[in-house]
């Protein structure tokens, strides 16, 4: 199914919690991209396609394949976000702002590249269960981690890969550490948009946002729920 089209996020996460086996995920086929690209080209419009990191998914390659089949190739650009989920969403928001301000495809791509170089994504997981089910860690590692109440803290590196950063004992310490990392790695937070993503823990996300505002007073804070593609594996 397509995320949010045939199954709501709440329904998806309810099914995921009860599942013994993880659902599988797949990138959109080139035909889906091609249809949208053709519609934009037929309307005389330029299009910028922003995809999940090519290091995490074949979506970028799928979009490039679609572009290659398009007669009006120069009207479309495919941009590798080198991130995922709400980090990718931030780039989409920035691209939309620029398009509405009248910037063209080339100008938008130039600015997106600058924004991408400054983008920073860090997160923690409450359980190792889904990493184990997805084959990313062994069952023994997952069991030991849960027994010791280990919460991994991960980040998306500049190549667009999810890599371990550190570990914390207990969720409270992990959340506190996230706030510290934002201060350590964030630049000019008073002038930045910070997006907080969560998976079925909206109240905690709101509390985190409140603490973030109190400590660092960023320009803007938004909260969103993580979609099924990333949620499946985390």
Regions found by a protein language model. Name each.
Residues 27-31, 193:
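Short coil/turn segments at secondary-structure boundaries
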Residues 24, 49, 78, 195-196:
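Short catalytic-loop micro-motif centered on adjacent basic/acidic residues
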Residues 1-5, 19, 55-77, 83-234:
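Mixed-charge interfacial surface used for oligomerization/domain docking
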Residues 1-27:
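N-terminal glycine-rich anion-binding loop in soluble enzyme alpha/beta folds
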């Amino acid at each position: 199914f397509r995320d949010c089209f045939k199954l709501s996020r709440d329904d998806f996460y309810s099914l995921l919690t009860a599942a013994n086996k993880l659902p599988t995920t797949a990138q959109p086929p080139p035909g889906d991209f091609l249809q949208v690209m053709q519609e934009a080209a037929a309307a005389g419009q330029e299009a910028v396609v922003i995809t999940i990191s090519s290091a995490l998914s074949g979506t970028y390659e799928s979009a490039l394949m679609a572009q290659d089949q398009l007669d009006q190739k120069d009207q479309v650009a495919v941009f590798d976000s080198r991130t995922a989920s709400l980090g990718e969403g931030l780039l989409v928001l920035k691209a939309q702002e620029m398009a509405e301000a009248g910037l063209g495809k080339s100008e938008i791509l130039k600015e997106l590249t600058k924004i991408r170089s400054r983008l920073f994504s860090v997160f923690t997981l409450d359980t190792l269960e889904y990493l184990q089910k997805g084959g990313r860690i062994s069952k023994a590692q997952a069991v030991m981690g849960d027994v010791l109440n280990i919460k991994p803290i991960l980040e998306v590196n500049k190549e667009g890969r999810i890599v371990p950063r550190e570990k914390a004992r207990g969720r409270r310490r992990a959340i506190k550490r996230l706030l510290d990392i934002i201060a350590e790695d964030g630049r000019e937070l008073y002038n930045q948009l910070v997006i907080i993503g969560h998976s079925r823990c909206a109240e905690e996300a709101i509390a985190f946002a409140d603490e973030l505002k109190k400590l660092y007073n960023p320009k803007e804070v938004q909260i969103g729920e993580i979609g099924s593609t990333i949620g499946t594996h985390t």
